[in-house]
């Protein structure tokens, strides 16, 4: 196949529609824009949510609820089968090992989930474990080291 054989062929492409070239064309006069108003003018753009200057619906309705975005804690989930496949035969898996293998972005909070089976005893270090994942690892003779979230690590006990 050559460049000139690619579809659509230049002669098959529809030519550009030229508007405003007389009423006989069917696209003369207002050029398909209707009569007057903001949208008939050149450069007439308005945001999809703009309501013509009246108070927008988003501002007319009251706020509701609570937004917890600044304090949201997001974990990077990793399934047991993927974790153990990446560290085949290794008896201890640290958080740095997980980051180095690219299973989670560096610095991400890691949670181990229970999809997959544990054949050999292995020590796994992560921020959080699902109950079933921890159960599977300990049942195979392994050890679970839950680091917790950074906030939990920096908290000082009060008396």
UniProtKB/Swiss-Prot annotation:
It comes from the Bacteria. Residues 14-44 are annotated as: Disordered. InterPro entries: Ribosomal_uL15, Ribosomal_uL15/eL18, Ribosomal_uL15/eL18_sf, Ribosomal_uL15_bac-type, Ribosomal_uL15_CS. Keywords: Ribonucleoprotein, Ribosomal protein, RNA-binding, rRNA-binding. The keyword Electron transport does not apply. GO terms for molecular function: rRNA binding; structural constituent of ribosome. Transmembrane segments: none annotated. SUPFAM superfamilies: Ribosomal proteins L15p and L18e. Part of the 50S ribosomal subunit. This is Large ribosomal subunit protein uL15.
